[in-house]
């Protein structure tokens, strides 16, 4: 699997999965998407049935309307309209830790949705309004406010199977793969490089 950061419209159609990541400035970043031509490319991909995942701010961009008096001076703006869902920002930030390790930290809240939810909540109190599902799932589109949802091995494997199915491709899941074990391995590699190339005694002596 290869992950690429892209900033050109031509690359949007080629990916098996397009991810619109989190953003601390949803409205202004959405304006950049439009100015760069990426918004049109995202809409074309959605119309063609290409899988798209929006996470937090990326999910908010995929919705119909965004009303943000908290982090933006633009007022009510049109989203990409991929979900029939409206977002309103609230001064009180939503802070939730979910049982699978995923978490939410955002001002934007779903105030109306005409599309099916995606992730079943363990407790209706997890979602403002007591909804039984969080996020949206429509066709080849998925959106959630949850960061780290795919760090949970079972969640990720199920999601990647879905992506492969939508794309009509064979994808063999490594059932033994562990996100947390791999993250620890990568952190150990970074620590080894730092220990090898930095004079830690000198650095610590300055503290």
Enumerate the language-model features and the residues they cover:
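Residue-level signal for inorganic ion chemistry
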Residues: 18, 56, 147
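Cysteine-nucleophile active-site neighborhood
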Residues: 24-101, 109
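Amide-donor transfer/coupling interface in amidating biosynthetic enzymes
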Residues: 1-11, 39-47, 86-207
């Amino acid at each position: 699997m290869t992950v690429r950061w892209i900033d050109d419209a031509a690359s949007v159609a080629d990916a098996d999965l397009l991810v619109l990541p989190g953003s601390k400035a949803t409205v202004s970043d959405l304006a950049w998407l439009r100015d760069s031509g990426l918004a049109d490319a995202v809409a074309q991909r959605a119309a063609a049935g290409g899988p798209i995942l929006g996470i937090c701010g990326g999910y908010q961009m995929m919705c119909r309307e965004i009303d943000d008096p908290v982090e933006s001076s633009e007022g009510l703006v049109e989203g990409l309209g991929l979900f029939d869902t409206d977002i309103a920002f609230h001064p009180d930030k939503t802070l939730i830790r979910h049982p699978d390790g995923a978490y939410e930290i955002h001002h934007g809240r779903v105030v109306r949705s005409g599309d099916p939810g995606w992730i079943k909540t363990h407790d209706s109190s997890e979602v403002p309004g007591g909804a039984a599902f969080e996020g949206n799932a429509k066709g080849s589109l998925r959106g959630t406010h949850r960061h780290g949802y795919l760090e949970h091995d079972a969640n990720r494997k199920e999601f990647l199977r879905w992506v492969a199915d939508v794309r009509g491709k064979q994808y063999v899941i490594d059932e033994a793969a562990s996100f947390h074990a791999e993250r620890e391995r990568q952190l150990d590699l970074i620590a080894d490089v730092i220990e090898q190339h930095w004079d830690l005694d000198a650095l610590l002596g300055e503290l």
